[in-house]
């Protein structure tokens, strides 16, 4: 677990507001270690992960969680299936962030919530992470909170809140009744 995981989990649970009837998708959930906490709170949880080896590990060591191999730009899951979609410290890694937002919106039920935890590139921690990402030659793209808010709104989602934390910021948005 990374990014102060224990604290991050507590904050995510607070912002996600999981209901026992919820079906939740964790985008870029890796091996499902954090997802395991969500699984205790909701009806069903799915991890979407692009790396085959990571998916196999998750399936082996967390058989109670469904792992789906795939990319956020083309989520291999049905329309309007999930009550909540969580992207915890993964959005900056999406190769095509606009397409990723469209797909996350597509698989959300009407009035479903999207929760994104991201690193704020204007903070000391965010600046250090950007340097690390550039050293590792990743193509990470970070947004300041107001920029991500605008991007999410451009995709037809209603932003309910953007809250800064010591770990970055949380953006919570809701999908309206439209498809």
Give residue ranges: language-model regions:
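Conserved alpha-helix/loop element of class I SAM-dependent methyltransferases that forms part
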Residues: 3-20
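A conserved beta-strand element that flanks and buttresses the S-adenosyl-L-methionine
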Residues: 86
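C-terminal lobe and adjacent flexible extensions of AdoMet/dcAdoMet transferase-like proteins
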Residues: 171-179
């Amino acid at each position: 677990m990374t990014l102060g995981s224990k604290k991050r989990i507590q904050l995510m649970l607070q912002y996600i507001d999981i209901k026992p009837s919820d079906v939740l998708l964790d985008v870029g959930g890796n091996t499902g270690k954090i997802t395991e906490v969500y699984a205790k709170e909701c009806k069903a949880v799915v991890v979407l992960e692009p790396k085959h080896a990571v998916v196999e590990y998750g399936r082996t060591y967390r058989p109670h969680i469904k792992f789906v191999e795939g990319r956020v730009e083309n989520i291999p899951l049905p329309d309007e299936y999930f009550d909540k979609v969580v992207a915890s410290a993964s959005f900056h890694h999406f190769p095509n962030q606009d397409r990723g937002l469209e797909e996350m919106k597509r698989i959300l039920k009407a009035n479903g919530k999207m929760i994104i935890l991201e690193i704020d590139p204007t903070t000391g921690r965010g600046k250090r992470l950007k340097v690390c990402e550039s050293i590792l030659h990743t193509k990470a793209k970070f947004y300041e909170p107001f920029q991500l808010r605008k991007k999410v709104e451009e995709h037809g989602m209603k932003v309910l809140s953007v809250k800064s934390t010591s770990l970055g910021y949380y953006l919570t948005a809701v999908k309206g009744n439209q498809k």
